[in-house]
Amino acid sequence: IGIVPTAVGGTYLSEWSPAEEGGCFYEMEKRVLKTGAFKGFIWLQGCNDCNEEDASSYFERFSNMVSSWNDRFGFHPILTVQLNRSMGHLDPKNDRYWGMIRDAQRRAALEIDGVYVVPSIDLPTTDGIHNSSGANVIIGERLANAALSYIYGKPGQESVFVLSAEPIDNTHIKLNLTPGHLVLAMDNLAFGMNVEDSDGMTDCIEAVPIKDGLIVSTSRPYNLPARFHYAWKAHPPVFVARDFFDMPLLACYGIEISAKDEATAE
């Protein structure tokens, strides 16, 4: 497999979208068109957009970028990487922006045709924000397995999504996950899981595996409307929920807790 390097570090989404600033896109376009035929894109970006101005619109702008790329190059799959942690940006007010970006990346793979995502939240960094060389090897393996499974229909390894959250009672919710994956939390402890309602944020204390899901209990009763977050902070807990094949559960932010026939993931 040949990879055409067009990456630029420390960039904003707007720099890759022809509908916005687009500077990096046009440089990429020149290089890509010189190569002739190609099969798809690898995308790992988002840290710079973890801010008040850009985070809330990331999903819509990413969707527009994908449409623009399809118009320019024809339809090609885009293999993406959900953001890893940042240990150098610990201002609590920034946590929500990291959650918004990670959730936009999760939603993109669920809602945009040809977009796929793998997790990186469990991997080591070199300086608190950049993935280590060992982490990049694992990311490459996950991307290759995703391509085999999603694009080529061959044995690989798929990512695990929180698809929806349902209320059971005022201290328990059911998370509906990608079918066919048994997800386990260490000692059934709900590290990095929170429910947010009109009274604020509450920690989740237990996550018990069931078929295609988790039963999560909260540290206090919650009120509806409420939303579920997982591994959403800039630097979430290091113990992450994983499936039986050691694939981490993708992070999510702001999933509405609602009855099954009303469930949405926003």
What does each model-identified segment do?
Residues 1-266:
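Cell-envelope and extracellular/periplasmic
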